[in-house]
Design a protein with these regions (language model features):
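Loop/turn elements at helix/coil->beta-strand transitions in domains of secreted/extracellular proteins
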Residues: 7-13, 37-43, 62-67, 87, ...
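Extracellular S/T/G-rich loop segment that most often corresponds to the catalytic His/Ser-adjacent loop
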Residues: 57-132, 204
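Extracellular protease catalytic domains of secreted zymogens
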Residues: 46, 68-70, 80, 85, ...
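Substrate-binding/access-modulating region of protease and related hydrolase catalytic domains
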Residues: 1-62, 75-77, 102-118, 191-193
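Residues that line or immediately flank small-molecule/substrate-binding pockets and catalytic motifs
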Residues: 17, 72, 169
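Short Gly/charged-rich anion-binding patches and loops
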Residues: 30-31, 54, 84, 161, ...
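Short acidic/His/Gly/Ser-rich catalytic and metal-binding motifs that mark active-site loops
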Residues: 22, 97-100, 175
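C-terminal subdomain of the subtilisin-like protease fold in secreted/lumenal serine endopeptidases
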Residues: 2, 10-14, 128-208
């Protein structure tokens, strides 16, 4: 993580490891703090694949990190039971991947380790589009760029502004729970305790 933090070409760091049950083991948060607070990058951290509180997780919990839980996109759009509670935001946690033990099959696999890089990918897409639009040919948030992730023609964007846009673009789904799906219904009362700001949504970011 520190190597990525100190690499000027890196914009976003995504990590999907941590102690089982979100036991607050110290260490990684020191490195992610350097990356975000000192080097002005963004960090997405996977919540545990359990209902444990993401806020105590060393990867997903620090205030400078974006803690990611999972939801069932293209399913019932509800909260996955086996992903952390009290995250910052939630993303689709299911991927359709080739089998590892044959050459012609596919399977679905799930976890916050998929939801987290998916969120990082959305952030990267947003950054690249802004750089293209405002003629910014650089990358990273080095001191030469004033600590800005985007520094173009009369236009700058910081890591805090990108994070705010991601938060504001999120949405809460309507109640449509399938009790056989392995999810839990997102409560209309304090849904933030289950999904944080909501479900990450690229299409909502563009107008912001």
């Amino acid at each position: 993580v520190l190597a990525a933090a100190n690499q000027p070409l890196v914009d976003v760091i995504s990590t999907s490891f941590g102690a089982i049950g979100s036991i607050p083991v110290p260490g990684i948060e020191d490195a992610t703090k350097v990356a975000v607070v000192d080097k002005h990058k963004l960090h997405t951290g996977a919540a545990d694949n359990s209902p444990s509180p993401a806020i105590q997780d060393a990867t997903a919990g620090p205030p400078w990190s974006i803690g990611i839980a999972g939801y069932a996109e293209e399913g019932d759009d509800q909260k996955e039971i086996m992903s952390g509670s009290y995250p910052d935001i939630s993303a689709d946690w299911t991927q359709y991947l080739p089998n590892h033990d044959d050459i012609d099959g596919y399977h679905e696999t799930s976890g916050t380790s998929f939801a987290t890089p998916r969120t990082a990918g959305i952030i990267s897409y947003v950054l690249q589009n802004l750089r293209d639009e405002f003629a910014d040919n650089g990358s990273g948030a080095s001191e030469e760029r004033g600590g800005m992730l985007v520094s173009g023609n009369n236009f700058t964007i910081s890591n805090a502004q990108v994070r705010e846009a991601i938060n504001l673009s999120a949405w809460y789904p309507d109640f449509g729970w399938d009790p056989t799906s392995g999810t839990m219904p997102i409560s209309p009362v304090l849904p933030c305790t289950q999904t944080g700001w909501g479900l990450v949504n690229l299409s909502n970011i563009e107008p912001i």
